[in-house]
Amino acid sequence: MRLARRYLISGRVQGVGFRFFAQAAAVREGLHGWVRNVADGRLEVRAEGDIEALECFERHISHGPPGAVVEDFDVTDMGADGRDTGFMIR
C-alpha cells in the first residue's frame, strides 16, 4: 500500500547537512518526494512510498545526521498522488 507523509522537524536541523541526509535515506528506501528548509528554521519533508519504507525512513530522519538535534518530529499522513519522481532537495 502506497502512502504519503509530511514531516516537520524542528531543532538544530539547518546547516548540518540534514537535507542531504534525508535525501540519501529516501533514495535508499525507494521513496519519492522532497525536502526543504523552512524560513522559521524547521525542515519540511514530503515522502511517498510503501509503508515499510516510510517507517524505516522515519527511524533515520527522526534522529538526523551527526550535528543535528531533533527537538520535535511531527508526522501527518497524506494521500499518495504519485506526482513526485525521485527525491529532490528544494
Predicted regions and their residues:
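Intrinsically disordered, low-complexity, mixed-charge
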Residues: M1-R90
